[in-house]
Amino acid sequence: MKLFNTLTRQKEEFKPLVPGQVSMYVCGPTVYNYIHIGNARSAIAFDTIRRYFEYKGYKVNYVSNFTDVDDKMINEAGAEGTTVPELAERYIQAFLEDTRALNIEEATLHPRATHEIPAIIDFIQTLIDKGYAYEADGDVYYRTKKFADYGHLSDQNIDQLEEGASQHVNDEEQGRKEDPIDFALWKGQKAADEIAWDSPWGKGRPGWHIECSVMSTKYLGDTLDIHGGGQDLEFPHHENEIAQSEAKTGKKFVNYWLHNGFVTVGKDEEKMSKSLHNCVTVHDILKNVDPQVLRFFMASVQYRSQINYSEENLEQAANILGRFKNTLEGINYRLADATEGLPDPDLAKLVTETTAKFEAAMDDDFNVQNALTAIYEALPAVNSNANAEKADKESLRLFAKKLAAWLSVFGLDVDKLLAKEAGDDDAVIEELVAQRTEARKNKDWAKSDELRDQLKEMGVVLKDTPQGTRWSRE
């Protein structure tokens, strides 16, 4: 299996620290609002990666944090007239509700920054003791230039970074920082009513970057197999995590850095951002969009690629899901009949070849498009066999099992996919389908067509097969 490592800018063979196990940390949301589709894209991308590791037999220790204190949290709590902990709890629950709807597996652990304050203080003190950090009027800053490898992950020169940073340092920080490029590890309390914790440097709260260094190494060890997040986190967040963690431990922090692509919106493929006021929340989308369609749409694009959120692309995803559903329904319908099966060597070979193509694609840095193409190209032959006079039932049964496993990698539950929406008119539909079957048996084509039209007006789609007529709702 090969992964594209942002640190080296190339694909590398995946070699876990412990054979058969994967330690994986993914930056979670700052919980001051409902998650938008950019947040969902990252969560779904890394959930798909996690699921494929599990499909391959790995045990995955997956840690994803909640940032439950920072400037955004404080500002939003003030605007809503609530406390930071109350705001965090509300949106953590909203996050869990949205991710459950999208069938995102819950993390092995969801640590919260505010629950890790003692560990954060200890981590910062170690950096001070080693000369990598310094206290200034209640704040603590990281001495960036002391870390020789700074800028490696984002492929940037530290002198250029320093020049850019000097233009963004406010007057208040100017007198405290040794260098404009230094960043905050601990922020001293600015107002008496501002959320804060006691520390050796006075009351205050942790900086954003230190939170992830502490939580990842506390729960996964000094060196991680994989660290994931959006491309927007590559700098400065992940760059700063490396500087903090490696300065403290003296060890390589992460072996494989993975970053997912951005989400664009609409026909113009405009980058989604709060500043452009084009953010769409999952909470709002799911009022009108089937969660399985949204999940499949987001999972069907390779994680490093940009993805465009639009009604047309959602509709295309729904159509592909419909093809998978029809194939599974056809197989199940055929397996339930009493006819004797007939082995088909070509179909058995196709199942084996499709499995190999699917895994080869996913082993190549999780190339989901090629994996889906392999499945999609197998459907016509499978459907044809399911509708044949004598089907290869064993191969059909195996393909259905494989397809369920493949779709599970994409976060789809086959049982939910195949579940028919119960309606008050189901019995009526069954009766009309039976009447039409009788009319066809009697070669009463006019009556058969009349019943088909009646069912169509009721939103029912019919499919005639040698084994009988199947129906589904549009």
From Swiss-Prot:
Pfam families with a match to the protein in the record: CysS_C, DALR_2, tRNA-synt_1e
Q: Which SMART domains match?
A: DALR_2
- InterPro entries named among the record's database cross-references: Cys-tRNA-ligase, Cys-tRNA-synt_Ia_DALR, Cys-tRNA/MSH_ligase, CysS_C, Rossmann-like_a/b/a_fold, tRNA-synt_1_cat_dom, tRNAsynth_Ia_anticodon-bd
Annotated EC: 6.1.1.16
Record's subcellular location = Cytoplasm
Query: GO cellular component annotations, sorted alphabetically?
Result: cytosol
Question: Motif span ('HIGH' region)?
Answer: 29-39
Q: Which GO terms describe its molecular function?
A: ATP binding; cysteine-tRNA ligase activity; zinc ion binding
Quaternary structure per UniProt? Monomer.
Protein name (database record): Cysteine--tRNA ligase
Q: Which organism is it from?
A: Lactobacillus delbrueckii subsp. bulgaricus (strain ATCC 11842 / DSM 20081 / BCRC 10696 / JCM 1002 / NBRC 13953 / NCIMB 11778 / NCTC 12712 / WDCM 00102 / Lb 14)
Lineage, uppermost ranks: Bacteria, Bacillati, Bacillota, Bacilli, Lactobacillales
Gene name of the encoded protein? cysS
